[in-house]
């Protein structure tokens, strides 16, 4: 099929914070759509999930995109993953299994039973590695990740490339001393584990999609957002996409390039050849004091594309220094809408402990990368169990699968002795529990299913929830002292806001907020 070479644009759009890059990109898309371009002939890719979610929502609202049409808006990793059907993503359960097997001889891996994991671990969520959660193994695999984003010439010789990168770039600063032989061992076993189980991680998605046998689709319009955050490896994917696309629009702000620590290389964006460069002239978000601070800082950036813009808002804004959170405690309350951020997560811990002590719900993003979003301090599973208990108190019925989750979190002696396991295990439970059409009231549970709990009591007197953030010998600085401490926090939060939804406080590193 002969390609239609009607489109030949190569454009770079620069815009500071609040200058309307997304709005400008959507105007570009609208022009093409108005001229007859079909939605599936335009691909929009971004660095982070937040970027993609925003683009999808706006295309649904402004262009009446269907759920099928929004499938042409995705992260770079998701685009690559969609071309790798024969692989499974490395999940949290897979990560735990690897860490367990790493302590044994690979020859004996086949003899090790796969352990049972929580329901959340079993879900297809991307697993990420970090030193806080995974210790030295996480730090080593972060080195591997950085190497793969930076060493592209011959990664088929992965171990050699990795060790060359390690020898050239590794300097101290880690909590643990990492030796050469440890890096070699963990990398070798990690690759063996992934191959044995047909698994891929974030870097594999990109690397394997670059293989010549993987054919990318043809697009008349390719739009790439947040270009300043892309690594060399991600730019390789963009290069492959652009070779098979007619028009290319690159949007970003090199002044906001703060992901160099994870392999991003803003110089590629700065030097990428285009026919036209467009600078968005005004920020509609920043008040004057914040704008002035940002402008003062840009003078310290050695190389930039000259993305100069003016402030549009009349408001001055507030810029203050505080010594402790108590100075703004009148603003930190139910209904607050704010971001608490710091350069590193250990600085954010202070925010989290403060919010925990006063009983406010918050969302956080710690060292997780592209695969994770902000997670609430009160999990969805906890909220659902509390809501279901409230339903039972009103005389309403709930599904059998919800009954099983509810009974699992009961305190001791609230089920007839010896019956609890049979009620919460899918292989042993009453078959009617698995019937999605049936509902069970509390009177039914009490009469037929050995439940001894008092329906008149508050959920706090019935359940004892678990948390992975309770102090142990391996986690001496975890957030909660014990399960009682965690459940007391849940009680305080519920008493302030039974919906757990009124407060919108984000706690994150600066990088996490931006991503």
List each model region and its residues.
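Conserved helicase motor core of SF1/SF2 NTP-dependent helicases
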Residues: 16-21, 27, 47-50, 221, ...
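Accessory N-terminal region flanking or inserted into the helicase ATPase core
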Residues: 1-15, 23-24, 41, 120-223, ...
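Conserved interdomain hinge at the start of the Helicase C-terminal
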Residues: 320-336
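Conserved two-lobed SF2 helicase motor
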Residues: 72-75, 201-209, 503-511
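Glycine-rich, phosphate-binding/catalytic loops in enzymes
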Residues: 31, 60-64, 89-90, 239-243, ...
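Conserved P-loop NTPase-based nucleic-acid remodeling module centered on helicase motor cores
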Residues: 41, 46-144, 358, 363-370
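P-loop NTPase Walker
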Residues: 1-91, 292-295, 508, 513-514
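Core RecA-like ATPase module of SF1/SF2 helicases and allied nucleic-acid translocases
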Residues: 19, 49, 78, 288-291, ...
């Amino acid at each position: 099929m002969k390609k239609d070479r009607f489109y030949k644009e190569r454009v770079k759009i620069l815009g500071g914070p609040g200058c309307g890059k997304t709005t400008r990109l959507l105007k570009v898309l609208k022009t093409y759509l108005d001229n007859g371009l079909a939605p599936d002939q335009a691909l929009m890719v971004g660095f982070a999930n937040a970027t993609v979610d925003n683009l999808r929502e706006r295309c649904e609202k402004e262009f009446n995109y269907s759920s099928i049409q929004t499938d042409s808006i995705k992260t770079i990793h998701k685009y690559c993953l969609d071309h790798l059907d024969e692989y499974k993503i490395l999940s949290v359960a897979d990560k735990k299994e690897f860490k367990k097997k790493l302590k044994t001889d690979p020859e004996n891996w086949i003899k090790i039973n796969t352990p049972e994991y929580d329901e959340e671990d079993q879900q297809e969520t991307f697993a990420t590695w970090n030193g806080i959660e995974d210790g030295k193994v996480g730090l080593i695999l972060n080195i591997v990740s950085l190497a793969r984003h930076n060493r592209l010439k011959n990664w088929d010789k992965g171990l050699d490339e990795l060790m060359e990168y390690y020898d050239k770039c590794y300097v101290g600063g880690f909590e643990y001393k990492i030796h050469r032989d440890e890096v070699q061992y963990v990398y070798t076993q990690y690759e063996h584990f992934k191959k044995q189980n047909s698994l891929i991680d974030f870097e594999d998605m990109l690397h394997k999609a670059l293989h010549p046998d993987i054919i990318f689709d043809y697009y008349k319009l390719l739009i790439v957002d947040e270009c300043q955050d892309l690594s060399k490896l991600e730019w390789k994917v963009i290069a492959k996409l652009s070779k098979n696309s007619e028009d290319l629009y690159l949007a970003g702000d090199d002044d906001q390039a703060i992901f160099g620590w994870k392999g991003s290389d803003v110089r590629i964006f700065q030097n990428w050849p285009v026919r036209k460069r467009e600078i968005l002239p005004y920020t509609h978000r920043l008040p004057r004091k914040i704008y002035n601070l940002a402008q003062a800082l840009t003078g310290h950036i050695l190389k930039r594309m000259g993305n100069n813009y003016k402030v549009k808002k009349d408001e001055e804004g507030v810029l203050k220094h505080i010594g402790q959170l108590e100075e703004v405690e009148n603003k930190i309350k139910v209904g607050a809408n704010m971001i608490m951020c710091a350069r590193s997560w250990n600085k954010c811990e202070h925010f989290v402990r403060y919010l925990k002590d006063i009983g406010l719900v918050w969302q956080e993003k710690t060292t997780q990368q592209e695969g994770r979003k902000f997670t609430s301090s009160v999990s969805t599973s906890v909220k659902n169990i509390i809501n279901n208990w409230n339903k039972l108190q009103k005389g309403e019925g709930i599904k059998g699968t919800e009954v099983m989750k509810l009974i699992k979190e009961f305190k001791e002696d609230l089920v007839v002795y010896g019956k609890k396991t049979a009620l919460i295990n899918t292989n042993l439970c009453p078959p009617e529990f698995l019937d999605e059409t049936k509902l069970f009231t509390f009177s039914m549970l009490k009469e037929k299913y050995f439940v001894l709990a008092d329906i008149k009591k508050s959920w706090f007197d019935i359940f004892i929830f678990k948390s992975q953030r309770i102090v142990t010998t391996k986690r001496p600085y975890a957030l909660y002292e014990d399960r009682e401490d965690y459940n007391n926090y849940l009680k305080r939060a519920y008493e302030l806001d039974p919906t757990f939804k009124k407060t919108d406080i984000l706690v994150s590193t600066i990088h996490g907020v931006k991503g």
